[in-house]
């Protein structure tokens, strides 16, 4: 299957410049400030995600990029053209962006092929027919061309929405919680399929989601948002292993915080033993800190120094997530292979093996 001939496939010196620049924008939502002095840059062919809880401002940012929401300060540039500012508002249809909405927003009275064609404007009937046929084939929808949205599965509706957004060959694809209405198994499969398709065709994409699994499946870079600001813009790996603040550490993945004190520039002593860091920590020796312990940092070891009781378990197929509690009432989360099968009430021995030590000053931890 040949790649989609996107407008951004040329790797000339101009094509190496950022496709999207958001510069210090602020936005209101229902008269309240929703986005504060936010900036981000997306290179051509890059897929990025804005990740955060409901109400953090991520959808407002996406709508501002699409041209559906004004900015109060700053500016937005697409392909070096300013499309948003206090006194600039290029309409959505003139921005050459494709949009996939949370509910897919398919026209219920139109067939699949007519839904896809609805995104094509100012093209000849012949070109429209060829573009629709091409997208039907690429999305595996050819045999569903004459069906209506209510006759399709959730995954098929998702493909139709994506085909409609990509048919005009936009410069930039925007997706708002595109997998939220799918069941877990389907959303994981669709997330990987969409990611592969975007990378294969060198399509630049910005997605917003509250689900870290969706963000990690798609995003080359992910921006974690809190209260209208990006608090960390990084790779999925660094967000998980090197969170820059307590909010990111708490929001990304599972884990618990263990109290400790610095005994050296790269070592922390805790009630469950000493932990060391590959690099120097930022605080003076003796500082009180909270150390992030991920489930994969807790290793099952029959000879381990830490004894704990199983108080909860969640079977996940190849693995089981255990909640453990020590005699000193310290709670840990542990992810063990499922053949290490323990029941609630069993005592297990574990050791801590922290590859990336993440610690924050105790006074910075919110109650």
Per-region residue spans from a language model:
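Non-catalytic connector elements of ABC transporters
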Residues: 2-8, 255, 265-367
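A short, flexible loop at the N-terminus of ABC-type nucleotide-binding domains that lies
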Residues: 12-22, 27-37, 86-90
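Short beta-strand immediately N-terminal to the Walker A/P-loop
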Residues: 48-49, 99
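The feature captures the beta-strand-to-loop junction immediately N-terminal to the Walker
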Residues: 51-53
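Helix-to-loop junction immediately C-terminal to a conserved catalytic motif
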Residues: 66
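Conserved coupling/switch loops of ABC nucleotide-binding domains, chiefly the family-specific signature
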Residues: 72-75, 227
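ABC ATPase NBD Q-loop/coupling interface
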Residues: 75-95
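ABC ATPase nucleotide-binding domains
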Residues: 96-98, 102, 106-247
